[in-house]
Amino acid sequence: MATEIPVGRKVRVKVPGSSANLGPGFDSLGLALSIYDHVEVEVIDSGLEVEVTGEGQGEVPLDERHLVVRAIRAGLKKADVIARGLRVRCNNSIPQSRGLGSSAAAAVSGVVAANALAGDVLDTDTIIQLASTFEGHPDNVAASVLGSAVVSWTNIPVDGTEPTYHASPVTVHPDIRATALIPNSHASTEAVRRVLPSDIPHLDARFNVSRTGVLLVALSKDPSLLWEGTRDRMHQPFRAEVLPISSEWVNRLRNQGYPAFLSGAGPTVLVLSTEPVEEALLQEARDRGIRVEELTVAGPVTVEDA
């Protein structure tokens, strides 16, 4: 029989955003970034109260359809606990549908909050597994859970049972910084995936495998390899037609020597480097309505009793 969480129990979660793919590492590499959502969850007598401020305010549902709420419910069920009612407050800074892991952060915050309310009965692997079921891949989720960079993978059993999601952290060189150029437009991951071909030439697959290896060395040991390590032939060339502004800025930045790439499904463009991007370039981006954020590599999700 499930244990009931006492009314009045409250936890606060701080979850970082993330970038996925990082150029060649399609659906496998992720990086936590210092832009955060804050979620407070309190057990109340009955019902559900949802409040959202910041990013997504006035746009996301304030009922059981809210992703954080769905993730909380999944976490409580997995932990075998129940709550009479929930009050959920979300203060969001991660831009939504921009390729910075907002949906993964929501799923992670909900599962982590539920686990904290239950007394921390779920281990890290279970949290990644549970949160990744909302995404269908673990790259952003694992980055938000573990912090730093991650290598992630999915195993799909031949017997048709549910996929299992896995990740391992990668320590990032301390000199690496991130600059995000965030266009004022949304990108649906599903829509942007539709332009990808079902098959790619063996030569291009080999190219991406080698560059993924180079990128891991660049991230952990030798940042001078970041430009070479962020080259890609698997997904970004095909997404250029539906993300023309992003493609323009990726090409402009790379042509000037900056390791730029599409963050996740876009439209955000991310630069990873040890030196700042030239201010004149960033100002031009701002003048064209593109938001610029100077970020650092973030640590893992954190939680505390409120």
Swiss-Prot record:
Know the name of this protein?
Answer: Homoserine kinase
Q: Cite the annotated pathway.
A: Amino-acid biosynthesis; L-threonine biosynthesis; L-threonine from L-aspartate: step 4/5
Lineage of source species: Bacteria, Bacillati, Actinomycetota, Actinomycetes, Mycobacteriales
- Record's catalysed reaction(s): L-homoserine + ATP = O-phospho-L-homoserine + ADP + H(+)
MF GO annotations: ATP binding; homoserine kinase activity
Provide the residue positions that the database annotates as binding ATP.
95-105
Q: Which UniProt keywords apply?
A: Amino-acid biosynthesis, ATP-binding, Cytoplasm, Kinase, Nucleotide-binding, Threonine biosynthesis, Transferase
Q: Does the keyword Lipoprotein apply?
A: no
GO BP terms in the entry:
threonine biosynthetic process
Indicate the family of this protein: Belongs to the GHMP kinase family. Homoserine kinase subfamily.
> Can you name the source organism?
Corynebacterium urealyticum (strain ATCC 43042 / DSM 7109)
Q: What is its main location?
A: cytoplasm
Read off the Pfam families from this record: GHMP_kinases_C, GHMP_kinases_N
Its Gene Ontology cellular component terms are: cytoplasm
For this protein, the Enzyme Commission number is 2.7.1.39
Q: What does this protein do?
A: Catalyzes the ATP-dependent phosphorylation of L-homoserine to L-homoserine phosphate.
| Location in or out of the cell | Cytoplasm
